[in-house]
UniProtKB/Swiss-Prot annotation:
Keyword vocabulary terms for this entry: ATP-binding, Glutamine amidotransferase, Ligase, Magnesium, Metal-binding, Nucleotide-binding, Pyrimidine biosynthesis
InterPro entries referenced in this protein's UniProt entry, alphabetically: Class_I_gatase-like, CTP_synthase, CTP_synthase_N, GATASE, GATase1_CTP_Synthase, P-loop_NTPase
Protein name: CTP synthase
Single Gene Ontology MF annotation: identical protein binding
Binding site for ATP: S18, I19, G20, K21, G22, L23, D75
Subunit structure: Homotetramer.
Function: Catalyzes the ATP-dependent amination of UTP to CTP with either L-glutamine or ammonia as the source of nitrogen. Regulates intracellular CTP levels through interactions with the four ribonucleotide triphosphates.
UniProt lineage: Bacteria, Pseudomonadati, Pseudomonadota, Alphaproteobacteria, Rickettsiales
Length: 548
């Protein structure tokens, strides 16, 4: 379905943050894909950080890394997993990035002495981001982070208003998500917060075309929808209910059942097209049957951000993708490496240590690695987990008692993990970093090739592919000086960076059924319809150990 001009769908939220804008945007994009539209999804975050790379996962959830090395909001992970389309730097921005660009332009004299203001200068830069590459798509879906009424979000809402003015309202749709709370004491749903949220949006010059009402257990009545439609000046049929679900892949089906797909296509002047959802029905049906499966695995994610499940959302998703493909019910528990739950890991069939930074909780993580190594429990270490697996092995097997990482101890006597100061980009140019560089600028980010050793477990897992590509986010690496000692005791480094610097990328233990560490982040490339081979093999190893 090729439209003569690109349409823009803006997804906004009110009443509460974390209301599901990213999942709604992802689900809508997948529905529009199935109708034949060429879609693109973009995220605009109003916070003043240039990117989320230096933000605490406890505040903002995980940092998602795109193929081109962009550190982005976790919603881009949802976008990729629902649509299968890889996002780039053109699909994510923040108020901080916009203002940095603005100040640089002003300092370079690009505004020719004009008084630089929010309107038109900031809004013009935001619109440049929105319009970028629009000739390649039929529909661009733009999610505005935060909630209506946030002071830092006003330039983004104003830009969304201006887009309709510039391209014509017939080419723009506004979708607003609100929370409809249920008061147990009175036994009723309350619509007033939604009314006030839409009123605040109206004050910014935007009248939503659709209102998606998030509810919990109580279902909205026809009277509730009529009331909201009347007070919010929205067609009754365009008031969509979105109840909490136990499986996010039900969301496209929920919107399809209420005709959101046909209503959007009709509003865009393309007729009442219908989305194909048979693939989502299959996913939901199979996951429902897995919940009743007799085979169940328990996996522990040992981290330090246990207070927020979104901190490891891509890892959890990748595990569930693999479990779905293998046909096993998987229970994932995030364990605080500093907490009392570390005292008993015997109930877990698999152990995973994800990416992270700093020495907080490393003792617990090292204990978990030792437990997995000694007891032949399937183990996967990702990024920081890869480095800690080397550290544990160096101390407890090789006998390097002073083994440490310069991340924790800059003056350590045996730096088995050290600062990564040079590597080759995909275009063969050399990237260099110093420890004195800005914190946000010392990472090796994005997709890089890795060469696998034949006859290794990794080579078999990747279907005997000699060169693979994975996404990275790290500033420390295994110190090549210590690799011979480690390999002499049974640790095989089965993957290395492809060009020039020979950075160790994959480790495995020769005398362990399944013990792997990877310097990269395989979770970022896993999809529900194409699970990542490492996670598939990891889950199969857990299944084999428990049920063989």
């Amino acid at each position: 379905m090729n439209r003569r001009s690109c349409a823009f769908i803006f997804v906004t939220g009110g009443v509460s943050s974390s209301i599901g804008k990213g999942l709604t945007t992802s689900a809508l994009a997948s529905l529009m894909q199935s109708m034949g539209f060429r879609v693109c999804i973009r995220k605009m975050d109003p916070y003043l950080n240039v990117d989320p790379g230096t933000m605490s996962p406890l505040q903002h959830g995980e940092v998602f890394v795109t193929e081109d090395g962009t550190e982005a909001d976790l919603d881009l992970g949802h976008y990729e997993r629902f649509t299968g389309i890889n996002c780039t730097h053109r699909d994510s921005t923040t108020a901080g990035r916009i203002y940095v660009d603005l100040i640089e332009r002003e300092r370079n004299g690009e505004y020719l002495g004009a008084t630089v203001q929010v309107i038109p200068h900031v809004t013009n830069l935001i619109k440049d981001f929105i319009y970028s590459g629009s000739d390649q798509y039929d529909v661009i879906l733009c999610e505005i982070g935060g909630t209506v009424g946030d002071i830092e979000g006003q330039p983004f809402f104003e830009s969304a208003r201006q887009v309709a003015y510039e391209v014509g309202k017939e080419n723009v749709i506004y979708i607003h998500l609100t929370l409809v709370p249920y008061l147990e004491a009175s036994g009723e749903l309350k619509t007033k917060p939604s009314q006030h949220s839409v009123k605040a949006l109206n004050a910014l010059g935007i009248q939503p075309d659709f209102l998606i009402c998030r509810t919990q257990s109580a279902q909205m009545s026809a009277a509730d929808k009529r009331k909201i439609a009347l007070f919010c000046n929205i067609r009754e049929g365009n008031v969509i209910e979105a109840q909490d679900v136990d499986n996010i892949y039900k969301i496209p089906l929920i919107y399809k059942e209420q005709g959101l797909d046909t209503k959007i296509s009709a509003l865009l002047g393309c007729g009442p097209l219908e989305a194909g959802v048979s693939h989502w029905k299959e996913i939901v049906g199979r996951t429902r049957s897995l919940a009743n499966s007799g085979k169940k695995l328990f996996v522990a994610i040992i981290g330090k951000y246990s207070g927020l499940c979104d901190a490891y959302i891509s890892v959890d998703s990748a595990l569930q993708h693999a479990a779905f493909a293998v046909g096993v019910n998987l229970s994932v528990q995030i364990i605080d490496a500093r907490g009392k739950d570390m005292s008993d890991l015997s109930k877990f069939d698999m152990i995973l240590i994800p990416g992270g930074f700093g020495n907080n909780g490393i003792d617990g993580k090292l204990l978990a690695i030792t437990h997995a190594r000694i007891n032949n429990i399937p183990f996967l270490g990702i990024c920081f987990g890869f480095q800690l697996a080397i550290l544990e092995f160096a101390r407890n097997v090789v006998g390097i008692k002073d083994a440490d990482s310069t991340e924790f101890n800059k003056n350590c006597k045996a730096p088995v993990i050290c600062f990564l100061d040079e590597w080759h980009r995909s275009d063969s140019s050399v990237e260099r970093r110093r420890q004195s560089s800005q914190v946000g600028g010392t990472m090796r980010l994005g997709g890089y090739n890795c060469v696998l050793k034949k006859e290794s477990k990794a080579y078999a897992i990747y279907n005997e592919t000699e060169v693979i590509s994975e996404r990275h986010r790290h500033r420390y690496e295994a110190n090549p000086h210590y690799l011979p000692e480690l390999e002499a005791k049974g640790m095989l480094f089965s993957g290395y960076s492809e060009k020039g610097c020979d950075i160790p990328e994959i480790l495995e233990l020769k005398d362990h059924p399944w013990f792997l560490g990877v310097q990269f982040h395989p979770e970022f490339k896993s999809r529900i319809f194409k699970p990542h081979p490492l996670f598939l093999s990891f889950v199969r190893a857990g299944l084999l150990r428990k049920y063989s």
